[in-house]
């Protein structure tokens, strides 16, 4: 009935707000919907929400603009350790992806277009895969002649870098400044036409 639909809707709205980090005045919003929630499982979820809010606030604070991520290291296709600090002096555009993620793969042509469009500018293109099977990742790189700097996050979602940036799903894109500090930990997708214009603005301003 309408009451059940309303209850389902408000629970889903709160869930997505917490997940996406829309935390402004959320405690009051939860208090306002509490009278609409009747189901035991929803009440239990609502009672657990403050813990999730605290975790979300911490993860978003950990990846706030200005946060230094340059100390993190990953493995490249040759098995060498690569540090994000290696790219200091250039902006870093990071693509968090995996070979089994169709939306991630759909962004690859747009990343390549941006690479060509911004060739010669002080920016590097880093793709960090969350594949747990290294061979699958390596085969994909070879088969698709992948460009840019290809790294793998061997611990998947358990890697401290993943926890710090508050990654909840892929693809996710990050932009770091020339010191390896966060400009945006969840920036626009390359397929969004605004992304190219934003990068051009930032890079032209830095020259």
What are these regions (language model features)?
Residues 91-92, 171:
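Alpha/beta-hydrolase fold active-site loops
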Residues 1-82:
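Oxidative protein folding and maturation machinery
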Residues 88-89, 95-113:
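Conserved redox-active cysteine motifs that mediate thiol-disulfide chemistry
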Residues 146, 153-203:
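Thiol/disulfide oxidoreductase modules built on the thioredoxin-like
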Residues 106-144, 156-162:
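Structural microenvironment flanking redox-active thiols in thiol-disulfide oxidoreductases
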Residues 82-83, 183:
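Generic structural signal for well-ordered beta-strand positions
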Residues 94, 126-128, 151, 174:
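Conserved hydrophobic packing residues within short motifs/helices of P-loop NTPase cores
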Residues 88-90, 120, 146, 167:
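Active-site acidic short loop of glycosyltransferases
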């Amino acid at each position: 009935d309408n009451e059940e639909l309303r209850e389902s809707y408000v629970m889903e709205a709160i869930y997505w707000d917490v997940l996406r980090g829309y935390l402004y005045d959320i405690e009051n919003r939860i208090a306002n919907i509490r009278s609409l929630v009747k189901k035991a499982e929803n009440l239990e979820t609502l009672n657990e929400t403050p813990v999730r809010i605290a975790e979300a606030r911490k993860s978003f604070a950990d990846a706030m603009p200005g946060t230094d991520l340059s100390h993190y290291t990953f493995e490249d296709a040759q098995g060498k350790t690569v540090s994000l600090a290696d790219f200091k002096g250039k902006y870093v555009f990071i693509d968090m992806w995996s070979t089994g993620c169709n939306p991630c793969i759909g962004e690859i042509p747009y990343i390549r277009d941006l690479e060509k469009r911004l060739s010669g500018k002080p920016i590097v293109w880093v793709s960090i895969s969350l594949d747990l099977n290294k061979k699958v990742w390596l085969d994909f790189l070879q088969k698709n002649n992948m460009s840019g700097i290809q790294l793998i996050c061997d611990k998947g979602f358990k890697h401290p870098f993943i926890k710090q940036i508050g990654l909840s799903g892929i693809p996710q894109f990050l932009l770091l400044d020339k010191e390896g500090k966060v400009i945006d930990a969840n920036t626009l997708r390359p397929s969004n036409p605004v992304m190219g214009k934003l990068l051009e603005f930032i890079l032209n301003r830095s020259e």
